[in-house]
Amino acid sequence: MSHTFVDETKRAGYVIAAVTVTDTEAIRKVVRALVLPGQRRIHMKHEQARRRRVIVSALAAMQVQAIVYDAARRYRTDLAARTACLTAIVEDIAARDGDTRLVIEQDDSVVRADRHDLFQLVRQAGITDRIEYRHQRAYDELLLALPDIVAWSWVRSGEWRRRISPILTTVRTVDPRKREARAPRPSGRVSGSLPRS
């Protein structure tokens, strides 16, 4: 079973990063080693510049795959942008083989809406038997640091985007005027996918 970890940033419009991991134990050891004594988790917003470089370099060397879902400021509300990004994530999971555990960083203000959306999206995509999803706090699941690092790096552009490029497989522009921002068709066969493992 692969695990896909999801986090958002609103710094430069609405962006969600999804990082897929197959060997969670090996990657968790690497992330745990990056957490400083006294820290509960890695959160790029609170890290010093030198540490950020170390963290991003470590991520770029990991055996993981990242996708950025960039809704920018194309939606009237953050919730609408989030729903569109979750739609794209479910489409991508539906297009690949195997089972997936989707772990979303918990934001209490959107958990209820997420659960409602995911319930519908997963069923529409026809993958209820291949996916489980849950929300967790970043300090309870160390691997939620991965999408935080990717999202943080993506919105800062330049050097930071270059640093994450070894693991970045796709950047999806999520746009209400384009087909990919809509809910998946019942067959679950839609364009755009995560690389097959």
Question: Which ranges hold each PLM region?
Answer:
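Phosphate-ester processing/binding pockets and catalytic centers
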Residues: 1-197
